[in-house]
């Protein structure tokens, strides 16, 4: 139920963790501007943390995503610039460029190993404490890859046989098949293979692909049947978890409800 985090998504975790690590290591100082390329949730989360800590925040986003994501970052006082169309590739290039300039710090969520560390050392451990039995499989959508790789690593430390499955839209299975297409599951499959996945692809045991329309239908069902108001990626995650549980005959499968539904009113 990571949609219940401050800022409304799972990304609140890495935002706090990465910014505080940067402070401790002297990479981020008073008066600096944090700059991040994001399809929305990490930008929202880092804008929230920047507001609390008194940093300026610049979010670089592609066009074509929900306007609520833009509005939330601005509500926290961040500047938002739109670069490119739907995929974050161009925004990422600009983020890397600015991150080298004096007075800027770029966490670089898609490449930074701190992303994996937070999910392994914190989120993964929290989930393990709540599980009634050892996890047999974790499935997570790949935005940065930090969540599914990090949590999978934590799970394999207590059950070497646990499997890690990566979720992608069936219209844009970038990692598994090299395809880059538009889709409606915002927050995953951003149009390229993240550095985290390039380094840790050997830790992925399998892939599952869910269509955008299935995901949105499931999102609506979750709200109407369970009273849980989440976004399309949560619908995709639940379908994937149920499918893998049945196909592989497993008892304990873990997945994530990543963000709140308020960002996707047009889809409801």
Task: List each model region and its residues.
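PLP-dependent amino-acid enzyme catalytic core
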Residues: 1-268
């Amino acid at each position: 139920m990571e949609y219940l985090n401050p800022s409304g998504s799972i990304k609140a975790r890495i935002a706090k963790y990465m910014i505080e690590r940067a402070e401790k290591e002297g990479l981020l100082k008073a008066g600096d501007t944090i700059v991040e390329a994001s399809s929305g949730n990490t930008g929202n989360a880092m804008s929230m943390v920047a507001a609390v800590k008194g940093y300026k925040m610049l979010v670089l986003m592609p066009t074509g995503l929900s306007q609520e994501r833009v509005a939330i970052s601005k509500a926290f006082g961040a500047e938002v610039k739109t670069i490119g169309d739907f995929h974050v590739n161009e925004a990422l290039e600009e983020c890397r460029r600015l991150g080298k300039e004096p007075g800027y710090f770029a966490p670089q969520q898609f490449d930074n190993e701190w992303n994996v560390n937070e999910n392994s050392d914190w989120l993964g451990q929290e989930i393990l404490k709540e599980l009634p039995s050892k996890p047999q499989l974790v499935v997570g959508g790949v935005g940065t890859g930090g969540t599914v790789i990090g949590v999978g690593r934590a799970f394999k430390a207590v059950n070497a046989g646990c499997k890690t499955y990566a979720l992608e839209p069936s219209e844009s299975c970038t990692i598994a098949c090299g395809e880059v297409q538009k889709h409606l599951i915002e927050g995953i499959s951003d149009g390229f293979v993240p550095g985290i996945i390039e380094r840790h692809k050997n830790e992925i045991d399998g892939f599952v692909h869910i269509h955008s329309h299935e995901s949105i239908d499931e999102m609506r069902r979750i709200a109407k049947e369970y009273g849980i108001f989440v976004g399309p990626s949560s619908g995709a995650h639940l379908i994937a978890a149920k499918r893998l549980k049945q196909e592989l005959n497993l008892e304990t499968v873990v997945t994530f409800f990543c963000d709140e539904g308020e960002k996707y009113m047009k889809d409801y």
